[in-house]
Amino acid sequence: MEKNCNSVAGHAGTLVKASSRQADDKAGSRVPPGGHLLQTNKTESQLLPCASPSDPVHWTNEIVPVVADTSAPAEAAPDQTVSDGEQLTRAPDETYYQRSESLAEPPAENELPAGRSRRRRSRWCLGCGCFEQVKTVVLRMLMTGFEKYAGVVYDHPWLFIMVSLLATAGMSVGIFLRTPESDVYTLYSLSGSPSQVTKEHLLDVLPPDRLLFVLLTGTSNLVTRETVTRIDSLLQGIESITLRRDSVTTDEFNHRLVSHDRSPFPETITFQDICAKDGSGKCQVQSILDLYPSSSAWGVMPIASASWPVVTNPVTHKVSRLDAILGKITTSVRLAEQGSGRPALTVVEEAEAMLMRIDLRGETIWKPYTAAFEKLVLDYVLGQDFGPDISVTAKAERSSYDELKRVSTLDVVEWLRLCAAVLVVFLYTSVVNSSKTHRTKLVPSAMGALASLLGYLGGAGLVYLCGVRHTTPAEATPFLAIGIGVDDLFVIINAYSLTYLHPNPKERVVDAIRDAGLSITITTLTNVITFIIGALSPYYSISMFCIITAGALTWGYVLCLTFFLAGLSLDARREARKEPLSYSLFWRFMPRCCRKSSYEPQLSPPLPLTAAASGLEEMRNESEEIVTADQTPPTHGGDLLTTYQLAALMVLYKKHTCQSRSSQPARRLFDRRDGTGTEETMSTPVPEDSERDRTNQKSCGTQVSTGIVDVRETGQDAASQRRLSSHIRDMTTQESIMLLKNFEKEMEQNPEKLLKLYHPEPLGNPGRGSRRFFRDYYGRFLGNTFVKATVLVIFAAVTALAIYGATTLKFGLSLKNITPQASYLRDFYSLHEDLFPSYGDEVTVFFAENDRWEDREVQMRYLQMVKELSEQEWAVVVTDGMSLFLQHAMPSLHSGNRKEFLALLKTWLEGDPIGQNFSTFFKFSFDNLIVWQFRYWMPHRDNTTTLYYWLKEGKDIVSAGKPYFHGEVHTALAVIWESDPKILPFTLTNLSIALVCILAISLLLIPDLTSAIIVVLVVSLVDLWLFGFMALIDLPLSMISMVNLLISIGYSVDFTIHVAHTFTHCVGASRKDRMVETMIVMGAPVTHGMLSTLLSILALAGSPKYILEVFFKMMFMVIVFAYTAGMVLLPVVLTLLGPFHPHGKRESGKAIACDSSAQLIDMEPLHGTGKEEHGVGV
């Protein structure tokens, strides 16, 4: 291939030999449209378009020389830009060559050029050689597909915009038709868990009652006649509530009743129909009224207990516990009176809280009507006004469902938060991608932010239309979709900004998508795979959330490649016409008579030759020729320089500039004549120390401003600029080809030669300032030895702190926490825990097996089990009718006589005043005991893991009675507690699967094993930090925080993959240089993606919803930790341990860039004008 290029170059030199003398008089050269410019001041030579040194040359068209008019006067290039203190000069072109119609194919292994050794198979994988070949083919196919697709979108932008908007509008209907799932046990329990099986068994044999509580609290004593009277009035109001049977059409979860037979129920359902009855046939209502024998004693007769806290009503014989009815009690003790026989009494003096408990029917067939009746009772109770000194709150079985349903719906505040997030992201993307020139990307940025929002509406809407129910965690989906979606916007605009060297707008868009399409596909795929793995979670709420979010991200990706890409195409046309944005958006559509001014693109006057030759910064001018937006784009040839080589040149130029400034005295350049020459005078030399200080403070860190500048501070810049311009003029075609072929070897041996290839980046190009910042400041800062040591020490301390925190991590999800802060239910939970600490969760122990209770040994074993259970600190109150019966009747019972046992038991439950309190605990058939139960209460605890282990201990005690009896233990929240000990294994398993899957995909970008291992370690560190700091901020590990840990994998891999992949392909002479090059290429997109996501997540700050609060805290830590790991820790580690192959062993030439790549100079003729289009850049 080298011979081919050399022969063609020699032929081109012969063709233009006649015009060489005229070229010597010109300060610069105009770039020929068919190739890449590199020329000499002796011979006007043309660098032909050719593939990289590793590719063969395939000429599809003959070379047609076009000789320019040599008599034309010298003029500056129409497109002159200045960056980093350089000035590029051009002269009219001499020849033009057509480029190949297709990408050059790589040579076969046996057709490698002379001197090129075959690529050795990697040591760590025997099949890596084959894998690399397959990967190369697949990547080329994907990039070619993106290239062709982008061309279609560019040709039909309005079609793609309208189709995408119409499709999104149709899909977004599902947002408004979604069905929320509010069953807390369905949302946050494990399907098929042991507790779930026990619950279903209990519902079949002995359905528990539905409990309704009314809690009154005051600032003073409530045990007064007035308060008791008002409680009686409240109870009478509840008993007077009625419910129309036909008005009930849905259940408590808002699911429509299908095939429901209403005939067994009365048309008007009253409280007597809906309440659960006790042994005497009365409704089971427990209140302070049960403590008085009659209404005349209300608030007058003292409430006293001989065996605290149990008290028995002397008239009704109803047994009550005072500490379960009254809260914040003040008592006094009355000593026993020997003469009257009155025992010692504990008397209630004051109580500041009262609790009323109402039992409602729990049968499955009655549930729809019971739930509807509960809603009426809640509305009535919460609407009562007891005055300023008494507050009322309540809790029903359906309360948690109602409140979860309320928080599962986007209210006005949430819509405002969402709009604020969209607005903030829109403003941020617009600011960072805007400039004062025609290159501003304000409109594409706005369309990109809008595309991320439309992605949520369309993707989530389609998922809802498919039958997926909306869950509470899905409230965070729109914020995540917006934050993650705009990342693709920054990557594409960054790739587009690096294609400014193309004269044709269509080619710019095509090349940007060809280079960035694979990158955004990989990152989107990693995020979607993360959520797909989360969708396999056994938790219903998390599974639905992951499905909804995956759909939103997928559709956002589609809109990015349709809606946003079409907008970028339209804006690229405008940029090619050099139209100001205001003209395109506003003045163009006004009548000519009303226009502010007629816009006619004007060419800027050419620069004087002397200014171009001297390279003075103050003579900077940005003038370009107008390009027809719809002209036929040129076909693609091989890239001469990849993005990584361009970044290496930027670093090399900066080092060269700093060295030249510190080693040479200042020069004053001033044109004393008529613009045809310059005169240089030497100023007083600057001391080395002061010059070095000025270099560190200004020259090596800041951009030289335009305009008239102090030559005492910029004279050295002019010298280096003039020297670089001279290098460019003196470079021959043969030398340029050899430099490009041996780029990496020259980087190691003769780096100053490569400065001849360095070209400036135009002003106003999006991301230009960010790239300069990461090169001049951030990269140099991280490369400092002291800074690297400090970073490692800080992250070691953070890791140690995280390890400590991980050892104190708590688990579980409290029902109180997922309740909205402004909810009456949350107030009830808080007050009940404070005023009634011993009465937390009610536990039911039931026996549904046909055990031999008539046997004496079984009875003794049972009494022993109850005694052991009662002695536990977590079994505060044990209410057991069977124990009381056995203590009462055991002396008269004969072992083994079942008929006698059942008869005495029935008699005790029906006739004994004490036994009547337990009659509803037993269920008989005609001649047998079917099932019976007893209850105990556990104290309140915030740690649900502790409650789970208490329940487990209770199960173990009951299970120890086998084979004498078979009992089962159940409490309502057990199905949620049971997930606590399993949440950590589930989390670690999902994290491992996600990490393996994502790294498998990432190997497409990082073939180096060392880099892959570093990525694994860094991502693992991020997860470790999250585990530790969750404990430090008192955030338990639950199913909600678990999904954030999965998200952290995606974020961490995105950041680290971008950095590690770029570092692997950089070509700097040292690890430090490659780290700086990595920051130049990926620093801005990664940083902007992080900040946009962070801004969208900030909209969740201060949300009253616990789940959104958890998402905000977790996502904030995820973003901060992932970014600092990828942009601070990883670059430092790579400078120490990163892959560093000697240039002689690396494959020179073109490297397939999966993120972004740019051509150094890429030209094509301007059809119909006879002029050429020029571009330079980095």
From Swiss-Prot:
Similarity comment: family membership: Belongs to the patched family.
Keyword Membrane: yes
Cysteine disulfide partners in this protein: none
Subcellular location as annotated: Inner membrane complex
Name this polypeptide is given: Niemann-Pick type C1-related protein
Positions annotated as glycosylated: 41, 433, 621, 917, 943
Keywords: Glycoprotein, Lipid transport, Membrane, Transmembrane, Transmembrane helix, Transport
GN (gene name): NCR1
Function: Likely facilitates the efflux of cholesterol and gangliosides from membranes. Plays a role in the regulation of lipid homeostasis.
Membrane-spanning ranges: 157-177, 412-432, 448-468, 478-498, 516-536, 545-565, 789-809, 986-1006, 1013-1033, 1037-1057, 1080-1100, 1114-1134
Ranges of residues in domain SSD: 414-570
Reaction catalyzed: cholesterol(in) = cholesterol(out)
Xref: Gene3D superfamilies: Multidrug efflux transporter AcrB transmembrane domain
One GO term describing the cellular component: membrane
Organism annotation: Toxoplasma gondii (strain ATCC 50611 / Me49)
UniProt cross-references to InterPro entries, sorted A to Z: Patched_domain-protein (IPR051697), PTHD_SSD (IPR003392), SSD (IPR000731)
